Amino acid sequence: MSLSGHTHTKEEVQAEVEAGEVQCPALCHQPVLVQECLTLLEPAIVGISRGADSTRDGAGAFFIDGTLGDGGHTQAFLHAYPALRALGVEIDPSMLARARARLTPFGKRLRYVLGWSDVFFASAYASAPASPATGRTAAGAAGVPGAYPAPQAVLLDLGISFFHYRGAMRGFSFAEEHMLDMRLDPQASQTAADLLNRLPQARLAQLFFEGGEERYARRIAQAVCAQRRQAPFCSARAFAEVVARVVPPMRTARFGKRRGVLGVLPKLHPATKAFQALRIAVNRELERLPRLLTAAFTALAPGGRLAVISFHSREDRIVKVHFRHWAKRCSCPARVPICSCGGVARASLITKKPLVPSCVERAANAASRSATLRVIEKR
């Protein structure tokens, strides 16, 4: 479901952010598809309001931002629904500190959890069913404090904050000289440099192809192995220079031409997809995503909605497959000849096709240009 012409590929449009072309004061991050998220999650939030339907203030509803970042989406929801309670989950301590500062005015309406979202949802909700009387679920292990009500709305924004590219100094961007780290969790054991310096050539090629859909994956892996025999990789710039020597320059991308709004992206850095793939591997993003989707969907209250914003085609395919599976009348495996699940769909697709940002938003916020939004409602 496109809001405008969408002629560029997802893998190409991230480059403007990574190349440092986006200008943003104080390293702020502009959340994407905010109005679309507010609109599509509104029925779940307002529908649960107890005696407050006329004011539509979200009374009695609980919202979880499973990828809090610096709090842009959560801020919008708390502004829109003055009685809404919320919880933000974030793995990066520096980002959580930024979110706390930004969201201080909302006081006790908002709680925070430092940790991976998939771990939080699994430990807080999957260990026990919700009580029909209270809607609450007993909290599990992994240091999750207290008990949380089943959420009416969950939002997952799978993108990386602008702060990570321009302010975190962990090697997410090839525009500046930083240590090649790329960990969202500073306690994680492996950095991006560790992977580049230790993985065999075949595994590196697989990493670049699967995480970045990089057509020159084998060529990059060969160049990396040749370079590390001379000196180990330490900086993001060193890796970017190696990739640039073996990958041809990419073409300029355009968007919105059919609708009369023309946007032009600069020529993309050859290392764009390789950096994306390396970041995904370091943080095990594609490995975590199926667990996160399943646990977040399980946590939802009946009638609750899950919204997921993804930024590259591999992520979006995973989201699409899971959503379609839950919306099927029969969810039995293909090898089972007779339906044993009862033939009742567990959810309804709210977005039959993914929503993408409008031409106006893409022109104003380069980071939004590869975003897609899918929403599902639990029955």
Swiss-Prot record:
GO terms for molecular function: rRNA (cytosine-N4-)-methyltransferase activity. Its EC number is 2.1.1.199. It catalyses: cytidine(1402) in 16S rRNA + S-adenosyl-L-methionine = N(4)-methylcytidine(1402) in 16S rRNA + S-adenosyl-L-homocysteine + H(+). S-adenosyl-L-methionine binds at G71, G72, H73, E90, F121, D157, H164. It holds the Pfam family Methyltransf_5. Keywords: Cytoplasm, Methyltransferase, rRNA processing, S-adenosyl-L-methionine, Transferase. It is found in: Cytoplasm. GO terms for cellular component: cytoplasm. It comes from the Bacteria. InterPro entries: RsmH, SAM-dep_MeTrfase_MraW_recog, SAM-dependent_MTases_sf. The keyword Metal-binding does not apply. One of its GO terms (biological process) is rRNA base methylation. NCBIfam families: 16S rRNA (cytosine(1402)-N(4))-methyltransferase RsmH. Specifically methylates the N4 position of cytidine in position 1402 (C1402) of 16S rRNA. Belongs to the methyltransferase superfamily. RsmH family. This is Ribosomal RNA small subunit methyltransferase H.
